[in-house]
Amino acid sequence: MKFSTLEHILIHLSFSICSIVITIRLINLVVTTILKPYDFSEKGIITTFLCLTGFLVTRWIYSGHFPLSNLYESLIFLSWSFSLIHIVAYLKKNKNLSRITASSTIFTQGFATSGLLTEINKSGILVPALQSEWLIMHVSMMILSYAALLCGSLLSAALLVITCRKKFNELLRLIESLSFDKIQYRNQRIHLFGKTYFFSVKNYYKIQLVQQLDYWSYRVISLGFIFLTMGILSGAVWANEAWGSYWSWDPKETWAFITWIIFAIYLHTRTNKNFWGANSAIVAVIGFLIIWICYFGVNLLGIGLHSYGSFKGMAS
């Protein structure tokens, strides 16, 4: 069997499994069945992880270099990183994080296997600037950081949605209470004590969910920030060897630095308990947008020292 055929089978098998997992989860939101979609989805993502690992190893052997030389390969590695985080979340029994990583895996892999990247989905000879032992260290750290930071930011976004929805519902109840006359108010008081337990339990679970989202978003973003720092530092050393300068302020480097600053601000807000929750989550959501600009948006420009990373070279 040719390497290209094996790659084709592995990548489309993993995409098909992800699609089935997402479909079952969507159906489960509407219809309750006797199946256990959570257990099935975990096994599906683990199988996807193994398929993607097989794809990366196969391409590594076939091409002779680590498969991070173009946008297509970096997207596959990003999808692999999401599935890796998903497995960690599964072992930690964190369903909230695993839901996000499963969706992220199917999104990135779906884009990678779409017709938009057909021209670069085949491995080629590395350009001279990429023929370095720093390729694995720098690009892998950057992609892992993107995966972790994106997952953490999505957890923060979920926290914001729940918090804003709660405040919106409280505002609606306040408006409704102001429109009631005295008779309606007395009738409400009769039923108030019967409903107190229901609302207290409901609010308790919401508070628990918000706290878990806040806790895990902080943990995952902290890990991503470490990877990002290592990626930037290793990239600076590599740049000095390749171009004779540690930093050149080209678009890719500039936006990577902006990304680092945004998440440094996020971590700084975590030092003050008054900024925990929604306040720090807002910074993380901003960081989510910045990451996509840094990773994908800058590549579309095709300018700067990382111009070969647009659609023909590295996409770190």
Curated annotation (Swiss-Prot):
The chain crosses the membrane at residues 15-35, 44-64, 71-91, 142-162, 220-240, 247-267, 281-301. Keywords: Chloroplast, Cytochrome c-type biogenesis, Membrane, Plastid, Thylakoid, Transmembrane, Transmembrane helix. GO terms for cellular component: chloroplast thylakoid membrane; plasma membrane. It is a multi-pass membrane protein. Signal peptide: none annotated. It comes from the Eukaryota. Its main location: plastid. It is found in: Plastid, Chloroplast thylakoid membrane. One of its GO terms (biological process) is cytochrome complex assembly. GO terms for molecular function: heme binding. InterPro entries: Cyt_c_assembly, Cyt_c_biogenesis_CcsA, Cyt_c_biogenesis_CcsA/CcmC. Required during biogenesis of c-type cytochromes (cytochrome c6 and cytochrome f) at the step of heme attachment. Belongs to the CcmF/CycK/Ccl1/NrfE/CcsA family. May interact with Ccs1. This is Cytochrome c biogenesis protein CcsA. It comes from Trachelium caeruleum.
